[in-house]
Design a protein with these regions (language model features):
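Membrane-proximal, non-transmembrane alpha-helical segments
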Residues: 337, 342, 346-414, 421-425, ...
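Non-catalytic effector/regulatory segments
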Residues: 9-40, 280-309, 316-317, 378-390
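Membrane-proximal stem/loop segments at transmembrane-domain junctions that anchor or position
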Residues: 48-80, 261-371
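Hydrophobic transmembrane helix bundles of membrane-integrated enzymes that assemble
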Residues: 1-33, 88-278, 389-481
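Membrane-proximal cytoplasmic C-terminal regulatory module of class A 7TM GPCRs
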Residues: 482-489
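Alpha-helical transmembrane segments of integral membrane proteins, especially early/N-terminal helices
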Residues: 42, 75-78, 134-141, 354-363, ...
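Extracytoplasmic loop-helix module adjacent to an early transmembrane segment
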Residues: 24-100
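Individual transmembrane alpha-helix segments
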Residues: 68-115, 318-332, 336, 385-394
């Protein structure tokens, strides 16, 4: 019913067309001159040295180097060891090796962009190829085309794609999340799920969990989702593959958590305390006393770890001994559990930043493009602009959205007894859980520091939820229309 006269699944053709459209969109938006990327903001250094790359012109002014302009070209250097723990550096290093083959003098950031683009196109093709099959070829075509259009409109937005030509870890997590969910849907929709598809799911899920230390706990949930795939096939080989994959995710997540450097823990803890709990508190003395922090550190309330000219230097050994080595993030969690109203205030603060896919304070253009300092591109920014204009600005608004989504998933799960359907629904439940997790963890783990960028994964998960709602609505509408047509014919 969903095949053409040559016996080909129409979704294959639409998937390839969607992949071609995604590639053309990427080339036109970020690779064709003027090249689009994101300015550094000071984060690239922890990735470049480990990946064998370096800044090509370090003599630029601070604003030019980190905020005003993205940079198209970088230099090559030796490989250094650093405290940045992430599999993201492996991806960047591979792009660096490809870059050396193409041009041994300078690294063009478009090589990295092309690597991300290839993975993004793969995800789009997987999603569309395994879109829901309908009873007629026309209905299947419409369903696949709608899904392709929504995926390109949302995740092809310049807000996401500008990240591809930067050394931030965000695009790595985005691509991994898309591939993880796409492969999960592909597995759930297959009559005989392939081991290579499950391997892709495991690799992508592990990439998300190891993209940054804050995402590591997600690997535990991904392992549970992998285990739920045991019933997709009944043979012993499949069960061994699933159990092995779940174990890899479990162990990888635990190792990622254990690998967090002490210095990074102390930086994040400082942010959680002084730029989180104690920031804007109406009861500073009480909160400091409850946490066991001496009153002499009161001037640090509201400061971040990288701020200059604080009353007490952030690297002061006494501060480390009396505060950062004595407290832990467990104390932060306990504080917020005792003072839920304070945590709600922090969630409202997060909600004020939750709709921003990209940081608007970072320039998108290389200086050679002749654009004003800090200029950003608004080409194909319909989705990101809509979010800024229309998304909730309070935690209560997002609570309602997530509760409604959870209830809808529960209803679909109960209605469908098929194990394959339930795995697909559970995949989206994991996405929603990851979104909620990605909103809460930055507040506990890093206070209000750089909230806009730290909520990137929240945006990814929220937008995947939106795509699933739109696709689900069209699926229901097409089924209803088909039923009405059949009833008229039979009547």
């Amino acid at each position: 019913m969903i095949r053409d006269r040559a016996g080909r699944d129409i979704r294959v053709l639409i998937a390839w067309l969607a992949g071609i459209a995604a590639g053309a969109l990427l080339i036109g938006l970020i690779m064709a001159p003027p090249v689009i990327g994101l300015a550094d903001s000071g984060d690239f250094g922890r990735v470049l040295g480990v990946s064998g790359l370096r800044v090509l012109h370090p003599d630029q002014s601070y604003e030019e180097l980190y905020f005003n302009y993205a940079h198209q070209y970088f230099g090559y250097g030796g490989y250094t060891l650093g405290g940045y723990v992430s599999t993201h550096v492996v991806f960047v290093a591979i792009a660096g090796w490809i870059g050396r083959l193409l041009d041994g003098d300078v690294f063009d950031v478009r090589v990295l962009g092309a690597c991300y683009a290839a993975a993004y196109i793969w995800a789009v093709v997987l999603f569309v190829r395994h879109s829901p099959g309908m009873k007629s070829r026309t209905a299947t075509t419409i369903m696949a085309a709608v899904l392709a259009a929504v995926l390109l409109f949302v995740f092809g937005d310049i807000g996401y794609e500008a990240y591809f030509q930067s050394f931030f870890g965000e695009p790595y997590a985005l691509i991994a999340m898309l591939l993880m969910v796409a492969s999960a849907f592909a597995l759930a929709s297959s009559n005989e799920p392939a081991g290579r598809l499950f391997a892709l799911f495991v690799v992508a899920a592990l990439a998300v969990a190891t993209s940054k230390i804050q995402n590591a706990p997600l690997g535990l949930v991904f392992a549970l989702l992998a285990w739920r795939m045991t019933g997709l096939r009944r043979d012993p080989r499949w069960r061994r593959q699933v159990w092995t994959g779940a174990a890899i995710l479990l162990i990888g997540s635990i190792l990622m958590i254990a690998a967090a450097p002490d210095r990074l823990k102390h930086v994040n803890l400082y942010q959680s305390i002084f730029f989180g709990v104690l920031k804007d508190t109406p009861h500073l003395e009480r909160d400091m006393e409850e946490l066991g922090i001496a009153s002499k550190y009161a001037p640090l309330a509201g400061t971040n770890y990288f701020q200059k000219d604080t009353a007490i230097p952030q690297n002061d050994p006494v501060l480390h001994r009396e505060v950062l080595q004595r407290l832990s993030h467990k104390d932060i969690v306990l504080y917020y559990l005792k003072h839920l109203s304070r945590f709600m205030q922090k969630l409202d603060r997060a909600a004020e930043n939750a709709m921003y896919i990209r940081p608007y304070y970072l320039g998108n253009y290389d200086a050679s493009a002749g654009k004003p300092p800090g200029a950003i591109s608004h080409t194909f920014s319909g989705w990101s602009d809509f979010k800024v204009a229309a998304m909730p600005r309070s935690a209560a608004g997002y609570f309602l959205v997530f509760i409604a989504y959870a209830l809808a998933l529960a209803a679909v799960w109960r209605k469908n007894r098929s194990g394959k359907w339930r795995v697909a629904v559970e995949t989206m439940a994991v996405v929603a859980l990851a979104g909620a997790f990605s909103c809460v963890v930055p507040l506990i783990g890093d206070g209000e520091a750089d909230l806009g960028k730290h909520l990137f994964m929240f945006n990814v998960c929220f937008d995947m939820m939106v795509v699933s709602v739109i696709a689900g609505a069209f699926y229901g509408a097409i089924k209803l229309a088909g039923r009405q047509v059949r009833n008229r014919r039979n009547g």
